């Protein structure tokens, strides 16, 4: 009897081809689209009517069932509210990681068991499998690095990985579009989404105003020596390393070096080299390749989604669930709130949320 697999389908080409490939492999496939967010000011973006229709139409083309699961309240609680809270604290969150943890692989895994399915799948570009030598399920980078999405999947647990299938991990984006074209899928030429799904216009400031009903309080721009340079329009508008759109002119390039929510200040530097640091601390760490970190481990680390891998040594932090990261070469502007993810070769060791950076080169 064929295994029953539930595929998360966003209405895009990746998840559509994932469903196609799994059906071709002999699975009994059902497509599921998550209803996560409604924005009356947006005609497109996360969970738009067009996306739901596209997913349903692809399922019709493939001859498989399609259902919509309403997770709007859970999404608001677990993704949107923490996103807003982090920005108001002057941090730079990655909501996709929270969404994967709480919904795409959290609530989704619970629902498929409830409905009697054997497996779950998504259209992420990554690979997973069982390592008999370690007795653990592993997460691996996609074969084609340009599209690899393992960074946003570091929070996966062993039970989730056991259930998961990632059929796109061996393919390039061009190959996926070619498969969609060849098989007449209606979404074959649909553009990729580029922004945070619930902020399709990319205007974070406007979203925060709508969500909170108020403007973030203004405060001071300060120099590295504490001198007041001018006024900012709220720390939620800035991120570490930012140069453009600061709203202040110093007669030369200036960069956000540090954001202090306690004092409501944004520290600027005119020296880009002062953004670099060699070490950081991360918390809320999730381990995949190991059960726990018991001592120093040499890895390659990535401090943001599009950042290159950098050699580092990780060691247990001072508090439970934390890790200290020492880079071989200084990294530009690691931002508190972002994820740092650790790799050994193709394998994801684990990752966590950056809380602070140390050893600035200034």
Stretches with model-predicted labels:
Residues 1-154, 165, 174-175:
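ATP-dependent adenylation/nucleotidyltransferase module used to activate substrates
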Residues 38-39, 121-128, 132-362:
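AMP-forming adenylation/ATP pyrophosphatase catalytic core
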